[in-house]
From Swiss-Prot:
Substrate binds at residues 50, 198. It is an enzyme of class 2 (transferase). Keywords: ATP-binding, Kinase, Magnesium, Metal-binding, Nucleotide-binding, Thiamine biosynthesis, Transferase. One of its GO terms (biological process) is thiamine diphosphate biosynthetic process. It comes from Shigella sonnei (strain Ss046). Pathway: Cofactor biosynthesis; thiamine diphosphate biosynthesis; 4-methyl-5-(2-phosphoethyl)-thiazole from 5-(2-hydroxyethyl)-4-methylthiazole: step 1/1. This is Hydroxyethylthiazole kinase. Coiled coil: none annotated. Its EC number is 2.7.1.50. Its cofactor is Mg(2+). The gene is thiM. InterPro entries: Hyethyz_kinase (IPR000417), Ribokinase-like (IPR029056). One of its GO terms (molecular function) is hydroxyethylthiazole kinase activity. Transmembrane segments: none annotated.
Length: 262
């Protein structure tokens, strides 16, 4: 399958839509990244909510623009809440995104994620090892880290997209986004981004938000990858290391939104 490149005009248009619609994103994400995820969404113009109680999660999934399920710090009570939210999201036609953190390394979360696939996610975002494991092609990964190149996971991503109907995102040095029939590659970013906890998880939240936008969902999701890579490049150019990267990254996201509104 041919891999196309995302145009800057497409990315800018999607960011304009993002800011215009300001999606309300229900983030059921892991404990490590909640603040960074919320700030990333806010910097781009979305509205985050971290609702995790089972009864509330189901109720909130019905009114949110989009739902994120991130299994990074999965527990049985949290799985129950996530299951309830996903069931309600399907019933309410709220698009939801799955981030199958470390699914290739741990059996419980792999079985849980496979169970959730029956509720038809709008998008799935993971690294190469996670996507390959979720597709049933291989089990691997070094905990939350990938042991495979993103390009090697393209066939698995295409298979997973066709089987689930989801837009599948494989992140790495180059990000690949596919619906099983089309594929888009997004270059850029910086290796320093992999040294900061939460950049991938935050991207999953932005992907979830983009699934609520009108227009071409594949292009909107690919645009999310582009914004994050652009912001990462700008932040690395301005920072002196990991400690100063995060505030510069959030500034860069905010500045991107201001540029498309100008």
């Amino acid at each position: 399958m041919q891999v196309d490149l995302l145009g800057s005009a497409q990315s800018a248009h999607a960011l304009h839509l993002f800011h215009q619609h300001s999606p309300l994103v229900h983030c059921m994400t892991n404990d490590v990244v909640q603040t960074f995820t919320a700030n990333t969404l806010l910097a781009l113009g979305a509205s985050p909510a971290m609702v995790i109680e089972t009864e509330e999660a189901s109720q909130f999934a019905a009114i949110a623009s989009a739902l994120l399920i991130n299994v990074g710090t999965l527990t049985q009570p949290r799985a129950q809440a996530m299951r309830a939210a996903v069931e309600q999201a399907k019933s309410s036609q709220t698009p939801w995104t799955l981030d199958p953190v470390a699914v290739g390394a741990l059996d419980y979360r792999r079985h849980f994620c496979h169970e959730l696939l029956s509720f038809k996610p709008a998008a799935i975002r993971g690294n190469a090892s996670e996507i390959m494991a979720l597709a049933g092609i291989a089990n691997g990964g070094r905990g939350v880290d990938t042991t495979d190149a993103a390009a090697n996971a393209i066939p698995a991503a295409q298979t997973l997209a066709r089987e689930t109907g989801a837009i599948v995102v494989v992140t790495g040095e180059v990000d690949y986004v596919t619906d099983g029939h089309r594929a888009v590659g997004i270059h850029g970013g910086d290796p320093l981004m992999t040294k900061v906890v939460g950049t991938g998880c935050a991207l999953s939240a932005v992907v979830a938000a983009c699934c609520a936008l009108p227009g071409d969902t594949l292009e909107n999701v690919a645009s999310a990858c582009h914004w994050m890579k652009q912001a990462g490049e700008r932040a690395v150019a301005r920072s002196e290391g990991l400690g100063s990267f995060v505030p510069h990254f959030l500034d860069a996201l905010w500045q991107l939104t201001q540029e498309v509104q100008a």
